[in-house]
């Protein structure tokens, strides 16, 4: 099957590579976001999907706004008679004229069990809300975001140690396997699909900068879920000795709940462990953190370097 591929980040590049390597598909062209400045030097750099495409000599198209530039895009794609467009984390909404262009239309890999968690942050939101399971959905692209008919879906278990990085790995693996299975089953007819139950739809928005700031008056489990939802793309932060510090990895402590909690209070756990008290009286064990202008470090390295004093707090 001849495919046009739309995607941008690392996980999308993994799916692209699987399609390139498969005998089931021929990737005719790739559409990805424009190159952006990255790193401390702000050097303009191609994204992972573009790099993968160029390594395999596949034509690449980039648009600042595919909605505003749809006529150019349609002209560009006209030289490549794709049967199907596959979309995974492209970063922009496709105009109707684009997604209806190929004979088999366009499909999207979404990181939740639709109609639950339609929107921009399904993976982060599933973790933030403390879900024990989520999944993937392959859907036709329609006029409204994530409301298209469903071709395939698969449940994925979430463990307490998962964060956005590990859950995205699971989603990418499951989504890749599902799309390859779909292509293998193709019999020359349009892919069968079922409508979503719109009455059961839930939604999630983009992560905001203020979402990163930890409020230690909240409960320990809620804070733990927020920290793992934000890692690694938007690190959770707090304040310590008038400087910002990133909290990268935590776990819930089994220490006894205190009836008169002091939210943000720091407590040593033997010589290597660091605990922070939360608003519900429970403690959150800090496993990895990153002080401002320093490299990430373990809790034991933080304790050795900063000499925590009795009564000091995060917040």
From Swiss-Prot:
(6S)-5,6,7,8-tetrahydrofolate binds at residues 112-115. It comes from the Bacteria. Its EC number is 2.1.2.9. GO terms for cellular component: cytosol. Transmembrane segments: none annotated. It catalyses: L-methionyl-tRNA(fMet) + (6R)-10-formyltetrahydrofolate = N-formyl-L-methionyl-tRNA(fMet) + (6S)-5,6,7,8-tetrahydrofolate + H(+). Keywords: Protein biosynthesis, Transferase. The keyword Oxidoreductase does not apply. CDD domains: FMT_core_Met-tRNA-FMT_N, Met_tRNA_FMT_C. The keyword Zinc does not apply. One of its GO terms (molecular function) is methionyl-tRNA formyltransferase activity. It holds the Pfam family Formyl_trans_N. It is an enzyme of class 2 (transferase). Attaches a formyl group to the free amino group of methionyl-tRNA(fMet). The formyl group appears to play a dual role in the initiator identity of N-formylmethionyl-tRNA by promoting its recognition by IF2 and preventing the misappropriation of this tRNA by the elongation apparatus. Belongs to the Fmt family. HAMAP family: Formyl_trans (MF_00182). This is Methionyl-tRNA formyltransferase. The gene is fmt.
């Amino acid at each position: 099957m001849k495919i046009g591929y739309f995607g941008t980040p690392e996980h999308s590049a993994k799916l692209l590579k699987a399609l390139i390597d498969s005998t089931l598909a021929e990737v005719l062209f790739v559409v990805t976001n424009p190159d952006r400045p990255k790193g401390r030097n702000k050097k303009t750099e191609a994204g992972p999907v573009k790099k993968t495409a160029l390594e395999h000599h596949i034509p690449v198209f980039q648009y600042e706004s595919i909605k505003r530039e749809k006529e150019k895009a349609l002209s560009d794609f006209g030289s490549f008679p794709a049967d199907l467009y596959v979309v995974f984390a492209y970063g922009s909404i496709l105009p109707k004229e684009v997604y209806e262009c190929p004979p088999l239309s366009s499909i999207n890999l979404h990181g939740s069990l639709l109609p639950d968690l339609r929107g921009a942050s399904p993976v982060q939101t599933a973790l933030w809300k403390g879900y024990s399971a989520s999944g993937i959905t392959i859907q036709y692209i329609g006029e409204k975001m994530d409301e298209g008919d469903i071709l395939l879906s698969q449940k994925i278990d979430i463990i307490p140690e998962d964060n956005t990085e590990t859950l995205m790995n699971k989603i990418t693996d499951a989504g890749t396997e599902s799309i390859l299975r779909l292509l293998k089953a193709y019999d020359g007819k349009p892919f069968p699909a079922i409508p979503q139950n719109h009455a059961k739809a839930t939604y999630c928005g983009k992560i905001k900068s203020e979402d990163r700031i930890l409020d230690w008056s909240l409960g320990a489990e809620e804070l733990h879920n927020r920290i793992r939802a934000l890692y690694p793309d938007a690190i959770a932060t707090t304040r310590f000795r008038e400087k910002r510090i990133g909290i990268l990895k935590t776990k819930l402590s089994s220490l006894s709940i205190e009836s008169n909690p002091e939210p943000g209070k720091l407590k040593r756990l033997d010589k290597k462990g660091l605990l922070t008290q939360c608003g519900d009286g429970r403690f959150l064990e800090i496993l990895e953190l990153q002080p401002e202008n320093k490299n990430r470090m373990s809790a034991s390295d933080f304790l050795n370097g900063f000499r925590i004093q009795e009564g000091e707090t995060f917040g």
